[in-house]
Amino acid sequence: MRLFFKFFYLSNEGFDNELCGNFKSPCKNIGYLFNNSRVDKNFNSTFYFSPGIYNLSSSIIIIDFQVGINLIGIGENKKIIITTHKGTRGVISYNSNLIIRGITFDNCKVKKNEFPLYVPETLTDYSDDKLDYLTLNYYIGTGGALQIVYSKVYISNCVFSNNKGRNGGAIFTVLSNITISDCIFYSNQALMRSEDGGNGGAIFFGLSTNAIILKSIFKNNMAITGGVIVQSNSELRVEDTVFAYNQASNGGVFLIFNDSKIESTRCSFYANYANISAIANIQNSFAFQKSCLYQENMASAMGGVFSLVDRTILFVTLSIFNDNYAPSSLIVENHGSGLAMFTNCEFTFSDNFKRQIIQSLFSISNYNFLLLKDSRVSNSKGNVIWCTSNAIIVVYNTTFYNVSSKVINIHSQGYFFSISTTFIECKAEDYLVVLRNGARGILFRNNFIDNNGILMVFTTYNSSMIIIESKFFNNIVRNELIAVRNEYTLQIYNSIFKNNIGKTRGCIISVDQLGKLTSTNNYFINNTSVYGTIINFVKKRFNYWHTDFQCFSTFKNDTIVNNTALVSGAIVYYRDKIIGTKYTCESCLFLNNIAHFGNNINSGFHSFSVIQASKVHSNEHFPALIYAFDQFDNLIRGKNDIRFHVSSCDDIHLTGVTSSTIQLNGVTALYNLKVNSPENHFCNLSYKSNPKKGDVKLPISILNCPQGEEMFDVSYQGKVFQCLKTIETSNIAKTVMIITTSILVLLILLCFGITIAYSKEKVINFGNIVFLILMLFSCLFLCIIIYVSIEPTNFSCQFSAIVFPIGIGILFTLTLLKQYKIYKLFKYSDFLKINTDNLKMVKYAGLIMVPVFLLVLIGVIVYPSKPTFILDLHTKTATKYCISRKYYVFSIVIVVYEVIILLTSCFIAMKSKRYHSTPGTFYESLFNSILIYNYTLVFIVLIPLFYTLQNNPTTIYLIYSIGSSILVFATLSIIFIPKINFLFRRKQIVSTLKKTIETQERDIQRNKDLLIFYKMFLIEKKNNNFNNNPIFNIHETFSSEDEDEDEEDDIGEGIYSLFNHWDQNKRKYNNNQIYPNQIPKQTTNSPSSQSIDFLNNPTIPKNKSINNLPNLFKKPKKKLKSKIISKSANSSPNINNNTINNNNNNNNNNNNNNNNNNNNNNINNNNNNNININTKRRKSMDPSLDS
């Protein structure tokens, strides 16, 4: 056939006329040439476009130009731009041959057809369905730049940008052959949302289209489905093409359906996006991908790269998948029933790839087939293969490296075949291979090396796994390498397990005895676990499939060497009871397998026994030893997860350490157990364990308390009974105090008898017999307390609480009144009326004791003291005390009150100190003061002891007893013993006093002579006009106090006054005058018949006259200085020891006169030397008698 060619030139600067179209005179509009019949269909016409923008007002319509139409751009394609008015398509090719080269189609947008539908006659043999598909579904508004129907089109070096169409934003083809080479498709769109629109953002390859795309770029194209290309019943071959940043709702790059075919070679897919299928959504079609790169493509729902539906076949080889993402499936979402095969592919994820939700790389949810061969998956963070159907999955010679989740996860009755697969350095947070719900799996010559995770292989729910000639080296698992559950079938042949570690349970195999386990010709070497290094039989679970399923296990020709269990079960460990037969291995080699706390075969906790005492005292400590055993009667050693608890029956209260955890040695103890119940009770203690393994009940009975102990309820809430040793007052203390008190009682009675018998004696009468009797009765009451307080009873507690404070109060009160009366009488010089009126004394004592009586009465009535046992559980003793809840408050008030009485007494005693040795008082003031001081000292010591030492009955009794005894003894020894001594040793006392006085007189006379001589010497010196001579005032009584008060005086005045005083006494004596003490004269002159209280007045001897004295002793003519010589230290009258001496000497003189002794000179001299010479004070004084 002969071809004819025509050439036309077009330019924006050209003119449309009959002569245009040549190089020198180009036409402006290509439509002018077609509309004016200048283009002959029998010629191959070529249109050359000069650089410029050609804005078409109507489409370039090419119909039946089978010889050929060529649209050629001159120069750069970017400078030759064909665009159209809004709503106008660029080129329409019907039944033609078209070549387009070097032209840019920009912003061509079509909404409807401008030309009636052309259906070639050759289509009349098509079925009505296809004609309907062609004319109605995809024809209207398609192909913004090109619409190609039943044509052959070759496009090269063109740019399609910003074009829009209902289907096929740039190109739409039907029944055509199209080749696209070296083109760029940029920002084309198919987004019309009317029915059946929005398909193929760049190209729509429709019915019976054969397309080839070479070395092109598709970027930023957009559609509802098929962001770049939609294929429907067409074939496409793509080579060396780049697809980047395209997006769609479904199929970010391709939407391939309706028996289409696509073959992609050396293509790159980068950062494409879709909701479903970031690259291709393939439905009922065939896709072949070779040597392609898929990087960072993303689907928001599923199918990060591919989605397969219906009978689709996908074959991918020699391709790389890097950082693609979809939450459901990063690579393939397969809902079809076809095949998906990946060979020699690499699936990688960079360190920067961080997504929160990753389900899997391959998701299979229908009956289909997946082949992963000669590939590598690395750094995956999700499941690699997820299957929820009965699909067939084959993994051959593939490596899984650093996978952090499951590699195979089959949830239904699928089939998994792994051949020559390697799992290396996977750090799975879960399992690597999982088969569930009847799935079947075979691992043939697989390698598990340096992996770390929970498990490597897991099958459950009637699933089966066969492992043949596989190797498990250097893996670390939390549980075991292989775990099978619930009617499983696990068969392991000719495999090696070496240097694996199980961190928490077993190491190699974990089974639940509800399946079939076969191990033949395997090697288990240097593996380590906690329990059951080789096989760990865990607790059985519910049988989901058959209730009569039995376990069958076969172990044959295995080699088990150098395996270690950190706790127990170096080879086998049963966590639950044995259901089937025990582990036995035929023709197996066991060598150097070690369990640190067990044997080669052990089981978990199976039973326990308890050792406890069968008879104890109530609330007595006793231990219970518990031993835990496994099913092989070995102690459960090395565990601490078994807890035991003991409980008692209702009528016995149990305390102590009632719960405990098993120790590493398999034994635990419940320490300090105590059962509390009255005597002779019986109970069964129930011991329980957790995990529960049946109760152990042991009888225990409550014994009677041993001798010397009693049963007490030691709890504030009751029901806690304990035998305690009763602490009583020491027998030695009782004996000693009873003897001591008895002696004191005898002394009291003796004193009482003597007081009554000698009541008229002055020494008794002077002390006030009522006072003495009351004191004796108070002492007797205190002694009675000692007898009564031996044993705490209701009476003794009340009696002691009443009598003790009242008794010591009476003693303190009487001594206070006595001392006060003595002080008052001497202070007002009424000392001669020393006897206190009895009625007044009783009255005053009663008034002082009223507060004590009231406080004791109120305290005893409101808070009565009762005997109560005080329990000390630390020492296991019970001590009986007299206790009142708040009586101590009243007792403190009473103590304070009585301390006030004592302090007042002490104060008065200190004020009365100068009256202690007053003559004629029998030293009542002195002895009473001493008694007060003793009372105070004893009471101050007794009170703190009484309130602090309350923890022992012996101590309390001794405080009462010794305190009372000391008070009684002090009273008797200070008040009564001196009087009794005076009554029965009167002569001896008088004789002793006489000798003492005579000795004192001689000493005084000698000293006085020396002083007078010295005085005379000084006077003589003074008369000789010596200057600065010391002048001494010599007091004739030699009182230190007088020396301090006297002024310097002349010695002559002193001597004159002395003899003048003697003369006055002489006259009084001769006239039978008696001193104011009104002591009657004695009728006899015998010393023995005279009372010790009677003292004669001193006299001046008659044979001595004052006139006969030397001049030195005469009264000087000058007037005497008035002065106060001395104040007595004892009383207001000037009565002192010198006076006593003088009186005694006078008595001696009288006796000597009656016996006609001539010793008057000596007597007078003695009297002269010992008489006080204070004349002024003497006039107001009366002599007193001294005892």
Curated annotation (Swiss-Prot):
<feature type="glycosylation site" description="N-linked (GlcNAc...) asparagine">
    <location>
        <position position="684"/>
    </location>
</feature>
<feature type="transmembrane region" description="Helical; Name=1">
    <location>
        <begin position="736"/>
        <end position="756"/>
    </location>
</feature>
<protein>
    <recommendedName>
        <fullName>Metabotropic glutamate receptor-like protein Q</fullName>
    </recommendedName>
</protein>
<feature type="transmembrane region" description="Helical; Name=4">
    <location>
        <begin position="844"/>
        <end position="864"/>
    </location>
</feature>
<keyword id="KW-0297">G-protein coupled receptor</keyword>
<feature type="topological domain" description="Extracellular">
    <location>
        <begin position="1"/>
        <end position="735"/>
    </location>
</feature>
<feature type="region of interest" description="Disordered">
    <location>
        <begin position="1074"/>
        <end position="1187"/>
    </location>
</feature>
<feature type="glycosylation site" description="N-linked (GlcNAc...) asparagine">
    <location>
        <position position="275"/>
    </location>
</feature>
<feature type="transmembrane region" description="Helical; Name=7">
    <location>
        <begin position="956"/>
        <end position="976"/>
    </location>
</feature>
<feature type="topological domain" description="Extracellular">
    <location>
        <begin position="947"/>
        <end position="955"/>
    </location>
</feature>
<dbReference type="GO" id="GO:0004965">
    <property type="term" value="F:G protein-coupled GABA receptor activity"/>
</dbReference>
<comment type="similarity">
    <text>Belongs to the G-protein coupled receptor 3 family. GABA-B receptor subfamily.</text>
</comment>
<feature type="topological domain" description="Extracellular">
    <location>
        <begin position="865"/>
        <end position="888"/>
    </location>
</feature>
<feature type="glycosylation site" description="N-linked (GlcNAc...) asparagine">
    <location>
        <position position="55"/>
    </location>
</feature>
<feature type="topological domain" description="Extracellular">
    <location>
        <begin position="790"/>
        <end position="796"/>
    </location>
</feature>
<keyword id="KW-0807">Transducer</keyword>
<keyword id="KW-0675">Receptor</keyword>
<feature type="topological domain" description="Cytoplasmic">
    <location>
        <begin position="910"/>
        <end position="925"/>
    </location>
</feature>
<feature type="glycosylation site" description="N-linked (GlcNAc...) asparagine">
    <location>
        <position position="402"/>
    </location>
</feature>
<dbReference type="Pfam" id="PF13229">
    <property type="entry name" value="Beta_helix"/>
</dbReference>
<feature type="glycosylation site" description="N-linked (GlcNAc...) asparagine">
    <location>
        <position position="562"/>
    </location>
</feature>
<feature type="topological domain" description="Cytoplasmic">
    <location>
        <begin position="977"/>
        <end position="1095"/>
    </location>
</feature>
<feature type="glycosylation site" description="N-linked (GlcNAc...) asparagine">
    <location>
        <position position="397"/>
    </location>
</feature>
<feature type="compositionally biased region" description="Low complexity">
    <location>
        <begin position="1125"/>
        <end position="1174"/>
    </location>
</feature>
<keyword id="KW-0472">Membrane</keyword>
<feature type="glycosylation site" description="N-linked (GlcNAc...) asparagine">
    <location>
        <position position="526"/>
    </location>
</feature>
<feature type="glycosylation site" description="N-linked (GlcNAc...) asparagine">
    <location>
        <position position="794"/>
    </location>
</feature>
<dbReference type="InterPro" id="IPR011050">
    <property type="entry name" value="Pectin_lyase_fold/virulence"/>
</dbReference>
<feature type="transmembrane region" description="Helical; Name=6">
    <location>
        <begin position="926"/>
        <end position="946"/>
    </location>
</feature>
<feature type="glycosylation site" description="N-linked (GlcNAc...) asparagine">
    <location>
        <position position="35"/>
    </location>
</feature>
<keyword id="KW-0812">Transmembrane</keyword>
<dbReference type="InterPro" id="IPR012334">
    <property type="entry name" value="Pectin_lyas_fold"/>
</dbReference>
<dbReference type="InterPro" id="IPR039448">
    <property type="entry name" value="Beta_helix"/>
</dbReference>
<feature type="topological domain" description="Cytoplasmic">
    <location>
        <begin position="757"/>
        <end position="768"/>
    </location>
</feature>
<feature type="glycosylation site" description="N-linked (GlcNAc...) asparagine">
    <location>
        <position position="177"/>
    </location>
</feature>
<feature type="compositionally biased region" description="Polar residues">
    <location>
        <begin position="1074"/>
        <end position="1105"/>
    </location>
</feature>
<feature type="glycosylation site" description="N-linked (GlcNAc...) asparagine">
    <location>
        <position position="44"/>
    </location>
</feature>
<feature type="compositionally biased region" description="Basic residues">
    <location>
        <begin position="1114"/>
        <end position="1124"/>
    </location>
</feature>
<feature type="glycosylation site" description="N-linked (GlcNAc...) asparagine">
    <location>
        <position position="557"/>
    </location>
</feature>
<feature type="glycosylation site" description="N-linked (GlcNAc...) asparagine">
    <location>
        <position position="258"/>
    </location>
</feature>
<feature type="topological domain" description="Cytoplasmic">
    <location>
        <begin position="818"/>
        <end position="843"/>
    </location>
</feature>
<dbReference type="Pfam" id="PF00003">
    <property type="entry name" value="7tm_3"/>
</dbReference>
